[in-house]
Amino acid sequence: MPVELLNIEGLWVRYNAAEVLRQISFRVAAGDYVGIVGPNGSGKSTLIKAALGLVGGERGNVALFGTPLASFTEWRRIGYLPQRLRFFNPNFPATVEEIVGLGLLAGKQLPRKLTREDRQAVEKTLEFMGITDLRKRIIGELSGGQQQRVLLARSIVGGPELLILDEPTTALDPETRDKFYTLLRDLNRDKGITVILVTHDTSSIGTYASRFIYVDKEIIFNGTFDDFCHSTEMTNLFGEYAQHLICHRH
């Protein structure tokens, strides 16, 4: 039976008096590739932040790797690429390999130099991501797609078992976005990394994710994308014409 990496039960979140999430429950097992989809303002990003303890829930329970969130300390097992992470100023004096190396310092006392083993891990990650030739470049000089590859490399260099990404393709053109999604699928299939991907891109995620969760303050649907395409929830959300357009790609 697959190991359970994330378990959320009955999660409610409020900001001041506003209800952001209500009665959220789902589980993620080792090897899953889960796409969490919903419109702007649906609470997708808040859900991820609550799962990582960055936002407090009004009630409900969250467990990571079988450990209650309040007691969890093994953060090296998780790679996280938040929605807004900016190293993109051309004057920011950090190279690609330095940015990737930062991913090995999570939970470490700073300042700390990278060990030889750390540098080898950075080298292997740069090679896997296809960005070895960029190692000495300043990250702010790179294209949006290259920057996202670097930030993804930073998230996986420590060898996480669970990778969580919040809207990582928002600024990318469609071709670069699809390449990025394919790369995530390779990480899931070839390296065995469990992936949770938050996006508003309903149509594309169906090609890549093995599980599909549609959120709009509460969970509207949790299952495969194919089942979603044939569900009344899909018809109610998008209408028959949009349903055909979204699902026809698959």
Predicted regions located by residue number:
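Helix-to-loop junction immediately C-terminal to a conserved catalytic motif
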Residues: 52
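Conserved ABC ATPase signature
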Residues: 138-142, 146
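Conserved ABC ATPase "signature" region
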Residues: 101, 115-134
